[in-house]
Regions:
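Bacterial N-terminal signal peptides that target proteins for export
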Residues: 2-14
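Sec/Tat-exported extracytoplasmic proteins
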Residues: 47, 61-68, 81, 88-92, ...
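Extracytoplasmic/secreted proteins, especially bacterial periplasmic and envelope-associated proteins
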Residues: 35-42, 52-55, 59, 76, ...
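Soluble metallo-hydrolase cores and metallopeptidase-like ectodomains found primarily
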Residues: 37-39, 114-154, 219-281
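Extracellular/luminal Protease-associated
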Residues: 123-229
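N-terminal capping segment at the start of a domain
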Residues: 36-71, 213-218
Length: 281
């Protein structure tokens, strides 16, 4: 048996810890069954039926709270994770130094359809750049995906705010598949839109819920392409913008974002080691 390292980051904490607790519970037996399939099934069964992990998740979410990389809450989560892991039967638990992105949301974002009093529910996408201090006001062009942007081209995209409005496919039983079918608008959409001259991007939140709470995640800017502000609208706010565009194709949107990316911040992976019987080194 070789040495096993289990690395817990707060981003993957829940799923990793399910496996961790299950593995350590089963690993305490003197002799494991040689039938790997049986052992794997036992691990999954333990993961799916144990309530311990949910208690830990409850503490992580409700006692420690948000854990954006580089934040004080993320540091608290690291210390808590090390403490929790030290209670299990690892041979060694330690922290590994690393640096993580340090993005700050800043003052609350504002988005409003020109001519309407009620603001839209909006949040900047993680790692987005900010708008100018006074915000941006521009015409909105609605698209259903990245392909639409490429078809429309620079002539119709330049100087506008691109509204990626493809919804999550509610017909798909697998929510993961539904999410995957729409998330490219968030991750790649802003850079694609910027390539064709867009000055900002708003997206319909990627998710299955019908509410007005924006779902963010991160966007990934491509090298060599200008970074433009990118934000997520709550589903109901996206519906409002969609309806406004049906009534008037020349709708203008005001958006103001105050986010900033600072130098990478120090953080840690938390690592647990189980030494093998045959090859402990």
């Amino acid at each position: 048996m070789k040495k096993i390292k289990i690395i817990i980051s707060t981003k993957l904490f829940f799923s990793s810890l399910i496996f961790l607790i299950s593995f350590l519970t089963l690993a305490q037996r003197d002799k494991l069954d040689v039938n790997d399939t049986k052992i794997i099934k036992e691990i999954f069964d333990e993961s799916l039926t144990s309530r311990e992990t949910y208690k830990l998740l409850d503490h992580l979410c409700n006692k420690i709270g948000h854990r954006l990389s580089g934040s004080s809450s993320a540091s608290k989560a690291v210390e808590w994770t090390e403490m929790i892991m030290s209670k299990y039967n690892f041979d060694k638990v330690y922290k590994q130094n690393l640096y993580v992105p340090n993005w700050k949301r800043g003052e609350p974002e504002v988005a409003k359809i020109i001519g309407q009093k009620k603001e839209l529910s909006v949040l900047a996408l993680g790692m987005s750049v900010s708008t100018p201090k006074k915000g941006i006001t521009a015409e909105v062009i609605e698209v259903q995906g990245i392909e639409d942007v490429e078809v429309l081209g620079r002539e119709k995209i330049k100087g506008k705010i691109v509204f990626f409005n493809r919804p999550t496919d509610q017909r798909l039983i697998s929510t993961g598949s539904a999410y995957g079918g729409a998330v490219d608008q968030r991750t790649s959409g802003p850079s694609i839109a910027a390539k064709y001259g867009a000055i900002a991007v708003v997206i319909r939140s990627v998710g299955t819920a019908f509410d007005d709470v924006p779902h963010t995640g991160v966007t990934r800017y491509k090298e060599g392409i200008k970074k433009i502000p990118a934000a997520a609208l709550g589903v109901k706010s996206a519906d409002r913008l969609e309806l406004a565009l049906k009534d008037n194709a020349n709708v203008k949107l005001f958006i103001k974002m105050n986010c900033i990316t600072l130098e990478d911040a120090p953080s840690h992976n938390v690592i647990g080691e189980l030494m093998g019987n045959e090859f402990p080194d």
